[in-house]
């Protein structure tokens, strides 16, 4: 009986740990993330969408190029990008465009001079 109780508890914990990933999204919000936006905007353009449900299946409503539009979803790795305390003296080309361009757990993050692969912030 004790073994069955422990197995049931283990199964509930395993399922429960997945709930935030499934239920953490708003209704109609698709999985995946938005590609980074290169901002700043020089024009004011009307949004093409307000929420993911207005986009085709494989697309997500994201702020990109000065307005919200349906764009291909990108996979997003766990963790957040660390804050960059530096100031850019010489902008460089982006070394990545999305998290999947980076190896392992590294994320594609905005830095002072462009985007590059960084370890996620702790905490």
Swiss-Prot record:
Main location, first listed in the record: secreted
InterPro entries: Elafin-like_sf (IPR036645), WAP_dom (IPR008197), WAP_four-disulfide_core (IPR050514)
A GO MF term: serine-type endopeptidase inhibitor activity
Residues making up the signal peptide according to the UniProt record: 1-24
Disulfide bonds listed in the record: 34-62, 41-66, 49-61, 55-70, 81-109, 88-113, 96-108, 102-117
Subcellular location: Secreted
Gene Ontology biological process terms in this record: antibacterial humoral response; innate immune response
Gene3D superfamilies: Elafin-like
GO cellular component, as recorded: extracellular space
Coiled coil: none
Superkingdom assignment: Eukaryota
PROSITE patterns: WAP
SUPFAM superfamilies cross-referenced by the UniProt entry: Elafin-like
Chain ranges of the WAP domain: 27-73, 74-121
Keywords of this entry: Disulfide bond, Protease inhibitor, Repeat, Secreted, Serine protease inhibitor, Signal
Function comment: Putative acid-stable proteinase inhibitor.
Protein name: WAP four-disulfide core domain protein 5
């Amino acid at each position: 009986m004790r073994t069955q109780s422990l197995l049931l508890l283990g199964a509930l914990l395993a399922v429960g740990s997945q709930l935030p990933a499934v239920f953490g999204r708003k209704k109609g919000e698709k999985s995946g993330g938005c590609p980074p936006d290169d901002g700043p905007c020089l024009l004011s353009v009307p949004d093409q969408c307000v929420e993911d449900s207005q986009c085709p299946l494989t697309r997500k409503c994201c702020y990109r190029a000065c307005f919200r539009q349906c764009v291909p979803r990108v996979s997003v790795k766990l963790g957040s990008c660390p804050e960059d305390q530096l100031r850019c003296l010489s902008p460089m080309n982006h070394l990545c465009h999305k998290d999947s361009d980076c190896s392992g757990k590294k994320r594609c993050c905005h830095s002072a001079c462009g985007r590059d692969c960084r370890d996620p912030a702790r905490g």
